[in-house]
């Protein structure tokens, strides 16, 4: 499975491409812009897009769905995202 994990920012987004079979990963710093992410979704073979729930996650989720990509939007405010010591 090829995962694209997005750390969304207002102006820039950090992209992590991860292949679960080979366990190889790569990073890309990308602008948080519709045209750029549209081309990114077209260019790369991605099985699922994972992102945090925040301002731009709505339109990025819609854009990924237009490309037929599965998405997982996570709330970082829930217990599942917290580390307990």
In which residue ranges do the predicted regions lie?
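Phosphate- and other anionic-substrate recognition elements at nucleic-acid/protein interfaces
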Residues: 1-85
């Amino acid at each position: 499975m090829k995962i694209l994990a997005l750390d969304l920012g207002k102006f820039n987004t950090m992209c992590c491409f991860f292949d679960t079979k080979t366990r190889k990963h790569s990073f890309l710093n990308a602008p948080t812009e519709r045209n750029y992410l549209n081309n990114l979704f077209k260019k790369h073979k991605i099985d699922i897009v994972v992102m945090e729930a925040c301002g731009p996650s709505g339109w990025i989720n819609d854009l990924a769905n237009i490309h037929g990509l599965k998405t997982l939007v996570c709330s970082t405010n829930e217990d599942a995202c917290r580390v307990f010591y």
